[in-house]
């Protein structure tokens, strides 16, 4: 079972909620103040957008220009937040380096004093040995005072001193070797960081382009539909909203599936073949799954999403050997619609965690499978660090001198929103009525399935 706090929707940010374990709240962010600013900006942005929407339809040009400027402003704010985070991180690094340099300076000064004392002692010992040598050869040297102060070192003391010097030299040689290795590692990491920065820059350019392109498409739809009134207008916007939330859902599922082991291919539930899923826009029928949980066990799943993120409660991970894995009926990316009769369609993340954590014994899940769309970038999800985080990078192309620029798809190919008002979706999401059986039998196509899809993926909330 997993839960997590909501991720604030910054300008250009993603909608998904981060999954984390129940009973282990996430750490406080280093940039709490930046999150507050982002929330205030989002609120002001939405307020201005609503004000622009109240302008007379005859002055649609003013609305269009105003929203174009708002898009540019949102992009600038996102870049400013990125730069602020970068500057803050660099500042922390410089502060840490300053502390290290001060510590090294103190150690160096102490070593200098010790070395000066050692040199002084060595000189005195050398003088004492020279005087002893002169005395043995019969040379008369006025050194009685020096002999009285210094006694010549014994052979054992000299051997111990030589051994100590040898150990110190070995430590020095080891430190030099470590410095060389660290320099090589630093050079390699700097190159890797340069590659990551190039990829992030390309991704940001792509996101900025898609943001502007989507805003333009929405404005075009608004201009085309300004003469529509009544049910036809509501139907159009319900369909648009359902399409947007469906693609958001699929994006979150792709991210969840990307965290799983590549050696364990993710399987769709039985009966969900690719052809039937394509006909239904990737949405499978509602199904019921029984899960048996002992009192000393957890459910064995991690969840993400929630009403505040604009997506349903999603299963982001299934832990091996736990009840969810043993039952075999739950899959990563399943949207949890209800559990033991408790409706979770319009539930926030924290509330869903509370409900799921309280379940005992035999538990009935009501879920629906949404197949993520195949993305060309998914082939590059190859890198996974020690913490289990995986990154979608183009390292081979970039490190080989390839073009770091990002290729942007036309959003019109991704979001098909004007294919007729009577387009049907096969997902029945009535919150009351017959919800099907455990045999994965889809409901018969009733009227206004787009309204049902809109109900599943929530209404807008700012």
From Swiss-Prot:
Source taxonomy: Eukaryota, Metazoa, Chordata, Craniata, Vertebrata
Give the PDZ domain ranges: 288-371
**Domain comment, in the record's words?**
The PDZ domain mediates interactions with FZD5, FZD8, ASIC3, GRID2, CFTR, CLCN3 and ADRB1.
Q: Which InterPro entries match?
A: GOPC, PDZ, PDZ_sf
The UniProt GO MF terms for this protein read: transmembrane transporter binding
One Gene Ontology cellular component term attached to this UniProt record is: postsynaptic density
- SUPFAM superfamilies from the xrefs? PDZ domain-like
Q: What is this protein called?
A: Golgi-associated PDZ and coiled-coil motif-containing protein
Q: Per the record, which residues fall in region Disordered?
A: 427-449
Q: How does it associate, per the subunit comment?
A: Homooligomer. Interacts with FZD5. Interacts with FZD8. Interacts with GRID2 and BECN1. Interacts with CSPG5. Interacts with CLCN3. Interacts with STX6. Interacts with CFTR. Interacts with ASIC3. Interacts with GOLGA3. Interacts with NLGN1. Interacts with RHOQ. Interacts with MARCHF2; the interaction leads to CFTR ubiquitination and degradation. May interact with CACNG2. Interacts with CCDC62.
SMART domains per the UniProt record, alphabetical: PDZ
Disulphide bonds annotated for this chain are none
Coiled-coil region list: 83-194
Chief subcellular location: cytoplasm
Q: What does this protein do?
A: Plays a role in intracellular protein trafficking and degradation. May regulate CFTR chloride currents and acid-induced ASIC3 currents by modulating cell surface expression of both channels. May also regulate the intracellular trafficking of the ADR1B receptor. May play a role in autophagy. Together with MARCHF2 mediates the ubiquitination and lysosomal degradation of CFTR. Overexpression results in CFTR intracellular retention and degradation in the lysosomes.
- Keyword field: Cell projection, Coiled coil, Cytoplasm, Golgi apparatus, Membrane, Protein transport, Synapse, Transport
GO BP terms: namely: negative regulation of protein localization to cell surface; protein transport
Compartments it resides in: Cytoplasm; Golgi apparatus membrane; Golgi apparatus, trans-Golgi network membrane; Synapse
Q: Which superkingdom does the taxonomy of this entry point to? A: Eukaryota
Q: How does it sit in the membrane?
A: Peripheral membrane protein
């Amino acid at each position: 079972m997993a839960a997590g706090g909501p991720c604030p929707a910054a300008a250009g940010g993603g909608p998904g909620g981060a999954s984390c374990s129940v009973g282990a709240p996430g750490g406080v962010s280093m940039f709490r103040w930046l999150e507050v600013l982002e929330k205030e900006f989002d609120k002001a942005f939405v307020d201005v957008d609503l004000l622009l929407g109240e302008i007379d339809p005859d002055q649609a040009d003013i609305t269009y220009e105003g929203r174009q400027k708002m898009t540019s402003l949102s992009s600038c704010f996102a870049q400013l937040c990125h730069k602020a985070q970068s500057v803050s991180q660099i500042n922390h690094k410089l502060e840490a380096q300053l502390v290290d340099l001060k510590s090294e300076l103190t150690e160096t000064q102490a070593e200098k004093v010790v070395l000066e004392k050692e040199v002084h002692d060595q000189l005195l010992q050398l003088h004492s040995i020279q005087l002893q040598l002169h005395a043995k050869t019969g040379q008369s040297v006025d050194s009685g005072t020096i002999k009285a102060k210094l006694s010549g070192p014994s052979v054992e003391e000299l051997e111990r001193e030589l051994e100590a010097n040898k150990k110190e030299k070995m430590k020095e040689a080891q430190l030099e070797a470590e410095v060389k290795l660290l320099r090589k590692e630093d050079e390699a990491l700097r190159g890797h960081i340069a590659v990551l920065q190039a990829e992030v820059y390309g991704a940001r350019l792509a996101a900025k382009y898609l943001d502007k392109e989507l805003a333009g498409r929405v404005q075009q739809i608004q201009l085309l539909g300004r003469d529509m009134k009544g049910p036809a207008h509501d139907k159009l916007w319900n369909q648009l909203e359902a399409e947007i939330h469906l693609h958001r859902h699929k994006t979150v599922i792709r991210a969840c599936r990307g965290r799983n082991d590549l050696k364990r291919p993710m399987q769709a539930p039985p009966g969900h073949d690719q052809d039937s899923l394509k006909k239904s826009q990737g949405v499978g029928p509602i199904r019921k799954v029984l899960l048996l949980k002992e009192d000393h066990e957890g459910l064995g799943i991690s969840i993400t999403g929630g009403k505040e993120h604009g997506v349903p409660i999603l299963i982001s991970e299934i832990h091996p050997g736990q009840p969810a894995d043993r039952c075999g009926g739950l899959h990563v990316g399943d949207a949890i619609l209800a559990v033991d009769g408790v409706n979770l369609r319009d539930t926030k993340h924290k509330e869903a965690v509370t409900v799921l954590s309280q379940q005992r014994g035999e538990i009935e899940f009501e879920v629906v499978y949404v197949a993520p769309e195949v993305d060309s970038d998914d082939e590059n999800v190859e890198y996974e660090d020690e913490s289990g985080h995986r990154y979608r990078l183009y390292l081979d192309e970039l490190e080989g001198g390839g073009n770091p620029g990002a290729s942007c798809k036309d959003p019109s190919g991704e979001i098909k929103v004007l294919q007729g008002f009577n387009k049907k979706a096969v997902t029945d999401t009535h919150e009351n009525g017959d919800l099907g059986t455990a045999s994965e039998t889809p409901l018969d196509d009733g009227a206004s399935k787009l309204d049902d899809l809109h109900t599943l993926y929530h209404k807008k909330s700012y």
